Amino acid sequence: MPRSLKKGPYVASHLLEKIEKQKNLKNKKVIQTWSRSSMITPVFVGHKIAVYNGREHIPIYITENMVGHKLGEFFSTRTYRGHNKKDKKGQKK
C-alpha cells in the first residue's frame, strides 16, 4: 500500500538538515546517507548524495527526473556473479 497523501513523503530529517546547510554554498560536498527509503524531493535537485548499498557509499547526482523516487531505487544491493558453467562431461555433442 502506498503512503497516505496527508502524511506527505518520507524524508529523513538529518538528510534535510544537511541539504539545507549546503543549499547556498558554491562548493557542494557529497552528502553521505544510509537512508535508502527517503523520497527525493525538489529540494534535493542539484546535490550529490552518496547512498549506502550495504558495502560502500555510491554517489549519485540528483536531477529533476528523479523527483518522486526513493534513493534506494538507483542502486542494487546484490552482486551478480553469473550462472555456474556446467561440466563438459555431461553435455551431448
From Swiss-Prot:
Cysteines engaged in disulfide bonds, as pairs: none
GO MF terms held by the record: rRNA binding; structural constituent of ribosome
Record bears the keyword Ribonucleoprotein: yes
Gene transcribed to yield this protein: rpsS
Main function: Protein S19 forms a complex with S13 that binds strongly to the 16S ribosomal RNA.
Organism: Phytoplasma australiense
Transmembrane annotation, as ranges: none
GO BP annotations listed: ribosomal small subunit assembly; translation
Keyword match RNA-binding: yes
Entry-linked Gene3D superfamilies: 30s Ribosomal Protein S19, Chain A (3.30.860.10)
Coiled coil (UniProt feature): none
InterPro entries xref list: Ribosomal_uS19, Ribosomal_uS19_bac-type, Ribosomal_uS19_CS, Ribosomal_uS19_SF
GO CC, any one term: cytoplasm
PROSITE patterns the UniProt entry points to: RIBOSOMAL_S19
Pfam family, one: Ribosomal_S19
Keywords, comma-separated and alphabetical: Ribonucleoprotein, Ribosomal protein, RNA-binding, rRNA-binding
Name of the featured protein: Small ribosomal subunit protein uS19
Family, per entry: Belongs to the universal ribosomal protein uS19 family.
